[in-house]
Structures are given as C-alpha cells and as structure tokens.
Amino acid sequence: MVCGGFACSKNALCALNVVYMLVSLLLIGVAAWGKGLGLVSSIHIIGGVIAVGVFLLLIAVAGLVGAVNHHQVLLFFYMIILGLVFIFQFVISCSCLAINRSKQTDVINASWWVMSNKTRDELERSFDCCGLFNLTTLYQQDYDFCTAICKSQSPTCQMCGEKFLKHSDEALKILGGVGLFFSFTEILGVWLAMRFRNQKDPRANPSAFL
C-alpha cells in the first residue's frame, strides 16, 4: 500500500476523527465531572463546554461515517464545516495570545462588577483572596464582606485581581497554544477529506464516477 493511496487516506481520516471523538468525549466528561464535584458553579460555563463537546462529536461522527463509506455529500459538508471551524478557532486562538495585561485587567474589572455577590464570595473563598484591585472605592466594601480563610490568618489578604491576572495569563497562553495546534489539525482534516473524496474506491465499479 502506497501512503497517499485510497486506503492510506481513508485510515488517516478515520484516525483523525477518532481523535476528535475522544477529545469531545473528554470535554463532556470534564464538564460533567466539574459540575458534579462543584468545582464550577456556573451552569453557563458547563453548558458551553458541553455544547462545544457535542458539536465536535457530531463533526467527528460525520467525518468518520463519510470516511468509512466514502460518502461524497458527508465529506463535502465535513470539509466546509471543518474549514469554518478552523477560521473561527484560529482567530480566537490568536486573540487569546495577543491579549495583553492591561486588556486582561479591563476584562476582569468589567466581569467582577457584573457578578452577583454570591459568585464573588465563591471566587474569594476558592482563590483565598479578598477584593479585586485596591484602586476602587468599592474595594474596602468588598474586603469587609470577604469570607476567605486568609482574612482570619493574616492582617491583609492578597487582592483577587492579582491572582486572577496570574491565572488568566496562564490560561490564555494554554488556550491559545492548544487552539492553534487543533486549528492546524483541522486544516489537515480538510486536506485529507478533499484528497480522499477525489480518490476512486478500488473496490467500486470502475465505470462509476468516484
């Protein structure tokens, strides 16, 4: 078997979609696990992660079925959808890597003041910090109502904004890097699907069109 032939392209496309299926199931499983253990309280975050996992699973199943059956229509739509996902994911990944510390601070500030008091309290206890940044008139109010453990162990607690910035910077780099990696695997998937779709099945009727 020559690599680049019908069987090789089929096996490579099947393997790539199996990887996508495993990643999607992992996303769904991690979201359910995080909700079950109470690590993430926001139903919107859980729902978003599960939705992404289900969407990726559907794409992977369509690609796998199209590859196994050499289904022209499925492979065509698989290429189109995967190409659109690549563009979207590439832009988002580059944006994650391009966000500077000043922009992160603005986003954290804006998010903090639209949160409910319950959510703020959960974050303060989770990160063991009090208040956001000591640059606002409401910081002292946040600090007074803070219930984090650090408040009873030391005279002052670290500001949550500093911890959020540290974690957000790490998270954005990881998300951007992983997103770029998967975006290039999606381009590989589009190329494999296009190549495989235009190859003739050696087991098919020689007079049939592809």
From Swiss-Prot:
Glycans are attached at N100, N109, N117, N134. InterPro entries: Tetraspanin/Peripherin (IPR018499), Tetraspanin_animals (IPR000301). Residues 1-12, 66-72, 195-210 are cytoplasmic. Its main location: membrane. Coiled coil: none annotated. It is a multi-pass membrane protein. Residues 34-44, 94-173 are extracellular. Belongs to the tetraspanin (TM4SF) family. This is Tetraspanin-31.
